[in-house]
C-alpha cells in the first residue's frame, strides 16, 4: 500500500453546521477585506497581462472565472479539512510571467505549460520533496527574477501620470493617505479606496467606454486544448513552479506559522498542483497559497475559528467568478491609465520586498545578474528571459560567489576558535 506524505489534520474536518457555529461578524469583516484586496489590484494585473499578450475579452473572462470560481472550491475543501485559513487563488508573479511569453508563444502552448507545472507540483506534493525543491535555488535569485518581471508595473504606474494625470494622481494620493493612516486603512483598504476614487475620476472626465452590447453577463468559461512545446516547457514551467512554491506558498506558509498555525505543506502543494491542472484548462495561471489574503484573515480573532473567514473569502470569490464577464467588461471599459495605476499601486510593496530580499544578504551578484537578464527581456533559443535570469543568476553565484562565502565561513570559524 502506497502511503501518501500528507499531513494528518489535528482535528476532524469541520462540517457545514460547525462552520456556521464558528462563524461571526468579525470573521466576515476580515473575509470581506481580504476578498476586496484579491479582486482589485491582482485582477488589474490579469487585465494588464491579458492586454499585453493580446488575449480576447473571452479569454480574460475565462481566466478570472478559473482564478476565483474554481479556486474557491479548493479553498473551501482545504480549509474545512484542516480547519485553518488556507485560501488558494492564483500566482500573481506567474500571471506577470505569462505576459512576455504570449508575445512569442501561442496561448495553447502557455496553457500546456500551466498543466505541466500543475503535474510537477502534484508530484512534489505526493512525494514529499517540496522542501528540497524550495531550497534548490537561493532565495535572492528567485526574488531578483520576481523584481525583474514586476518592474514594468512600477514603470507603467509612473507613465500613467503622463497619460492621464487626473486619474493617476487622485488614485495615488488616496492610496498614500490610506496607507499612512493604518486605522482607516484597516476599514477601507488602500487599493479599494484608490479604485473607488479612480472610478469617480473616470466618470467625471467622461472617459468610460462601455463595450457595444450588454454589460452584464454570467460566466461561460472556455475549455482550451493545450499544446506542449519544449520552448514553453523551458520558459515557463520552472519559473512558474518556483514562483508558486518559493514566492507564493513560501510566503503564505511563513505568515500562517507566524500567526500560530501549522499549515500542511505537502497537502497544500498537491492541492495547488491539482488546482493548476483544473484551472489551467480554462486558461488560468497556476494555483497557489495566497500570502496577503491569508495574512489579513489570520491576523485577528481566535485561531481555531479563522478558517471560517477563508471559507467566506472562497464563497465571495465563487460569486465574483460566476459573474466574471461582467467584471471583465467593466474593467476593460476603463482607460489604460486606470488599470496601470491600480496594478502599479498593488505591486509597490511586492517590488519593495523583492528588492530587499534580493540584495540584503548573500548571492547579491547572482541576484543582480538575474535581475538584469530578466529586465532585458531578450529571449534566447526562443525561451523567455525569466528562465535565463534564473540560469545565469545561479551560475554567477555558483562560480563567483561560492569562494567568497566559503572564505567568510572559514574566517568566522577561525575567529570563534581563537576566542
Where are these regions (language model features)?
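Interfacial segments of multi-pass membrane proteins
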Residues: 97-103, 178-179, 293-309, 313, ...
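Membrane-embedded alpha-helical modules
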Residues: 103-209, 312-411
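Membrane-embedded helical hairpins/re-entrant loop segments and their flanking transmembrane helices
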Residues: 3-25, 48-74, 238-307
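Intrinsically disordered, low-complexity non-transmembrane regions of multi-pass membrane transporters
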Residues: 1-30, 210-223, 399-419
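Transmembrane alpha-helix interface/packing and boundary motifs in multi-pass membrane proteins
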Residues: 34-36, 74-86, 182, 274-285, ...
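Transmembrane helix boundary and interhelical junction motifs in multipass membrane proteins
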Residues: 41-45, 87-95, 249-250, 284-294, ...
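Hydrophobic, membrane-embedded alpha-helices of multi-pass small-molecule transporters
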Residues: 25-42, 168, 189-190, 203-205, ...
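Membrane helical hairpin/interfacial module
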Residues: 58-60, 66-67, 74-130
Amino acid at each position: 500500500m502506497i502511503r501518501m506524505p500528507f499531513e494528518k489534520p489535528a482535528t476532524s474536518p469541520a462540517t457545514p453546521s460547525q462552520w456556521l457555529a464558528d462563524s461571526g461578524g468579525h470573521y466576515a469583516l476580515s473575509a470581506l477585506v481580504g476578498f476586496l484586496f484579491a479582486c482589485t489590484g491582482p485582477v488589474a494585473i490579469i487585465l494588464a497581462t491579458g492586454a499585453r499578450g493580446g488575449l480576447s475579452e473571452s479569454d480574460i473572462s475565462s481566466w478570472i472565472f478559473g482564478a476565483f470560481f474554481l479556486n474557491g472550491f479548493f479553498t473551501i475543501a482545504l480549509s474545512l479539512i484542516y480547519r485553518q485559513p488556507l485560501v488558494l487563488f492564483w500566482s500573481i508573479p506567474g500571471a506577470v510571467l505569462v505576459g512576455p511569453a504570449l508575445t512569442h508563444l501561442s496561448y495553447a502552448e502557455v496553457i500546456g505549460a500551466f498543466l505541466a507545472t500543475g503535474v510537477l507540483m502534484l508530484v512534489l506534493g505526493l512525494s514529499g520533496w517540496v522542501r528540497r525543491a524550495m531550497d534548490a535555488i537561493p532565495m535572492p535569485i528567485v526574488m531578483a527574477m520576481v523584481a525583474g518581471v514586476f518592474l514594468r508595473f512600477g514603470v507603467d504606474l509612473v507613465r500613467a501620470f503622463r497619460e492621464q494625470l487626473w486619474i493617476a494622481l487622485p488614485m495615488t494620493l488616496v492610496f498614500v493617505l490610506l496607507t499612512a493612516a493604518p486605522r482607516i486603512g484597516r476599514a477601507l483598504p488602500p487599493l479599494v479606496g484608490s479604485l473607488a476614487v479612480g472610478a469617480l475620476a473616470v466618470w467625471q472626465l467622461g472617459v468610460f467606454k462601455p463595450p457595444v452590447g450588454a454589460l452584464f453577463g454570467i460566466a461561460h468559461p472556455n475549455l482550451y486544448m493545450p499544446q506542449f512545446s519544449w520552448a514553453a516547457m523551458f520558459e515557463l514551467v520552472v519559473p512558474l513552479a518556483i514562483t508558486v512554491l518559493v514566492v507564493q506558498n513560501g510566503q503564505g506558509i511563513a505568515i500562517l506559522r507566524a500567526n500560530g498555525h501549522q499549515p500542511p505543506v505537502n497537502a497544500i502543494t498537491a492541492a495547488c498542483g491539482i488546482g493548476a491542472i483544473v484551472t489551467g484548462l480554462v486558461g488560468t495561471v497556476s494555483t497557489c497559497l495566497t500570502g496577503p489574503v491569508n495574512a489579513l484573515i489570520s491576523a485577528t480573532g481566535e485561531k481555531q475559528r479563522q478558517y471560517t473567514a477563508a471559507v467566506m473569502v472562497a464563497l465571495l470569490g465563487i460569486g465574483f467568478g460566476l459573474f466574471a464577464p461582467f467584471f471583465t467588461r467593466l474593467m476593460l471599459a476603463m482607460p489604460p491609465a486606470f488599470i496601470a495605476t491600480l496594478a502599479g499601486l498593488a505591486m509597490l510593496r511586492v517590488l519593495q520586498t523583492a528588492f530587499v530580499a534580493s540584495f540584503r544578504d548573500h548571492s547579491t551578484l547572482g541576484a543582480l545578474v538575474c535581475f538584469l537578464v530578466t529586465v532585458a527581456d531578450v529571449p534566447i533559443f526562443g525561451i523567455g528571459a525569466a528562465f535565463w535570469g534564473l540560469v545565469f543568476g545561479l551560475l554567477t553565484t555558483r562560480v563567483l560567489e561560492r569562494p567568497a562565502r566559503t572564505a567568510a565561513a572559514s574566517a568566522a570559524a577561525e575567529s570563534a576558535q581563537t576566542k
